[in-house]
Amino acid sequence: MIESSSFMKKTSSENSIGSRSNIHEASTFSSEHENGDQSLTISQIVIRSDFANETSERQSKIILERFNEGIKNTAFTDSPVLGRAQPRLDVSYFAMAHRNQIVELFDPRGQRFGTVYSADPTVEIRYLGSVAKTCRYFGSFGKHVLNVPSGHFAKAMTKNRPIIYGEGPHVIIDPTFEFDERYGFVNQQEPFINHSTINILRVPSGKVAKVWIGTQPLILESRREPYVFVDAQFKMVEDTSESGNNKYFKNSSATFMEHGSIKRIIPHTGEVAITYNNGILTIIPPPKDGKPVIIDSPTHNFEGFIQTSLQTCLFPSKETKQQAIKDNKNATSDEVNLKIFQTRDSLRVGVVLVVAFRIVDPEIALTKLGKEGIINHIENVSFADMGKAIQLSTLQEIMYFNDTKPSANSTNETVHTIQDRVKSHLARDLCEYGIELARLQIETMKVLDSEIAKKLAGQSVTSAEFTTKQATLVKEYDIKTTEARLKAETDNIALEQKGKAIIAEAQAKLESAQKQAQALLITAEAQKKVQEMQGELFTKYPILAEIELAKIKSEALKSATLYITPQDAGNFMNSPLVYMDRLLGHQQKLEK
């Protein structure tokens, strides 16, 4: 037998064609194998094809080599003349025949061929037909070729034991080999693959699976690698309410899951799990490692969860109301929905209490009261303390019951109000049972005497009218005050803006005057420097002084009328400049 095992034994050489050592020798084991306690893997139970990655030409050669191994006398011939001629086949087909039930494959490669003719009556040679090289399964008389598609497994039987083949071609020489092509191929991604005693289980993310191995329960968490079991006593627990693959799995986020003696618990923040280990109370808080708590003991029982976060209850509770109806079918709605007490001034009042509490020590609370007795105890002691307080108080005192939290001086023996009388006693009582009182309030209070109730209602209406009127007056006062404040602020803003404008204008004028003065100073300084430079220049070059003096004189004579007498004409013509100097000097003397 060449291939047919649930556990493969690989040899060192896998490449030489026709070598006996490269073939996966098959040996099957029953489910009671020696290594039953060890975890199995896919590679241990699935037979891999050792030539799946070869070329198609090489795969065909390997199939022919292995299929025809040990055949001495062939049933085929390349010359149809020497035998029984067969129709020409496509290159993608094998021809198959047998000699005395020894099956043989032949690859004609598109050429003419035939089967051998034998005159020996003891020799039977029969042509079995053609098969495609890609055919998923073919074979006869104990020789088989199995081409497993990509992404699939093939489930077969050998020696009445299951065997699974991986993708790729396989050549099996085994007279006990059985394979049904209709049901034998299975997708590798199937969450649960069952083949007789072989079981492959893939638990998806966010799911868990419940299984039995004989009488041993297992809860399998999600993981990347599949779980593999080879055991005839393996059994999956299915959920009959689900269909498809969902019936095999449960949500991993379930707070509690039980399977045989295994308990899988996930307490959430704000609660703890109640368990009893051999009858002893065991509290399980939320795990800090983020993993579920697994208990594997038939005598360790799970009772439930109890909240440790803040709880708020309305009393009378629903159960108390139902019991009141059961005790008195003619009870009125007030008698059912309210707890009735009598005040010190003999008035009947009905109340509804709001109690907020937190269980700070679950072990003490459960040990002393039990899970179902906690709420009942809180309700009973709340009404008991409230009843005592109401009996010692008048209706008016009760109406001013406003404080809702335990008094800061609750340990003080001197109490002055109904709040202290109720809350201090209740807080001390609950503390002994591992319970912390967070809030106590009368949610509803009703005076059952109709006449008193009407008077109180009238007082309430009058008080409401006065309150409304007072609120209106206060509102009007606030409006007028706001308007006056807005007007004053507006006027202040206007004055402030006007003052800023005047200051800005004066500042601008001051800056302008300063700049003009600076300009005059700069101009005078410049003129002074120019005159000093001209003086230095005229001193160094006198001719320039004379030229400048001539310019001044010419400017002075531009608009003047000069009268020259005949006796001065000769002097003027000889030296005009000298004549003009004398004339100007004479004129200046006359002016003096």
From Swiss-Prot:
Bias (Polar residues): 1-30
Coiled-coil region list: 480-534
Spans annotated as Oligomerization domain: 491-555
GO biological process, one term: regulation of DNA-templated transcription
Membrane topology according to the record: Peripheral membrane protein
Keyword Coiled coil: yes
Entry GO terms, CC: early phagosome; endosome membrane; lysosomal membrane; membrane; membrane raft; phagocytic vesicle; plasma membrane; vacuole
Chief location category: membrane
Protein keywords: Coiled coil, Endosome, Lysosome, Membrane
Region (Disordered): 1-35
InterPro entries: Band_7, Band_7/SPFH_dom_sf
Complex and partners: Homotrimer.
Domain topic, free-text comment: The coiled-coil region is essential for oligomerization and binding to vacuolar structures.
Family indicated by similarity: Belongs to the vacuolin family.
Role, per record: Negative regulator of late steps of the endocytic pathway.
Annotated protein name in UniProt: Vacuolin-B
Gene name, Swiss-Prot/TrEMBL: vacB
